[in-house]
């Protein structure tokens, strides 16, 4: 399992830099902005993570720019021909779109895992 920190709708994977002897992280999935943080202790790391996001949101407010989101709500999924065919047939049987079928499947998976 990976180490993930979450705050105000943003998340980052945490790693340890042996070279710098500190914990570090970067908010992934932003196309135009870079938010990184670090700390020598977990407490420092958490504080710097929250401060980095708060600073980013404050900067966006001051510059009247919209903060980027890590997930836009759409993605491309490569299912392979066989799984795609089965999903399409099942969506037709249920009288729903294939998109709705995949959303239901992901929601069901997340609920049980």
Region spans (language model):
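Generic structural detector for well-ordered beta-strands
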Residues: 15, 38, 76-78
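A short, exposed loop/beta-hairpin motif centered on an aromatic-Gly-Thr core
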Residues: 32-44
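N-terminal segment of the canonical double-stranded RNA-binding domain
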Residues: 1-23, 51, 58
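Positively charged, aromatic-enriched nucleic acid-contacting surfaces
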Residues: 22-34
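Short Lys/Arg-rich basic patches
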Residues: 62-78, 82, 92-94, 100
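Short, basic amphipathic alpha-helical segments that act as recognition/interaction helices
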Residues: 98-113
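A short, charged, amphipathic alpha-helix used as a generic interaction element across diverse proteins
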Residues: 41-55
């Amino acid at each position: 399992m990976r180490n993930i920190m979450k705050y105000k709708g943003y998340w980052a994977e945490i790693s340890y830099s042996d070279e710098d002897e500190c914990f570090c992280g970067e908010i992934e999935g932003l196309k135009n902005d870079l938010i990184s943080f670090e700390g020598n202790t977990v407490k420092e790391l958490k504080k710097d993570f929250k401060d980095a996001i708060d600073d980013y949101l404050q900067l966006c407010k001051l510059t009247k720019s919209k903060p980027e989101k890590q997930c836009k709500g759409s993605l491309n999924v490569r299912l392979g021909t066989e799984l795609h065919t089965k999903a399409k047939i099942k969506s037709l049987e249920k009288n729903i779109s294939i998109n709705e079928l995949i959303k239901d499947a992901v929601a069901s998976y997340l609920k049980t895992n």
